[in-house]
Amino acid sequence: MELLSIIMLYAAMTARDYAYWISTGLLSLMMAGSAYMYFTSPAIAASFENLGFPGYFRIELGIAKLLGVVALLAPTPRFLKEWAYFGFIVSFVSAFIAHVAVGDPISDILPPVVALAILIVSYVTYRKRTAAQHASAERA
């Protein structure tokens, strides 16, 4: 019986739901992975130093990214998810600007741009999903 309910759940998902979960999953994996690297990788520490940031900043940023992942994946209030999206946007735009400012190669400039594109898909589909949920709740 449980297998049937799982099948019904997947059958009820729309393309918008799939786009949301795939983009949010990718974004979350990227953020959790980068946070791990911020905590453990000497190369990342050197990169932050090259960008002119103090050593403690990468630890703070790693913690913030992990909190953002929790806010996106856990059943949290809407305002927390909105703040997580906003924080990630600030992080990606700042990373892009910092890499361009120090003359880093395109291989260092491109990842925040790709992450921002994935975030936009996640955010747009999140807003559409919540709007649809509110509309169906009002009809009921």
Describe each region flagged by the PLM:
Residues 2-140:
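Membrane-interface extramembranous regions
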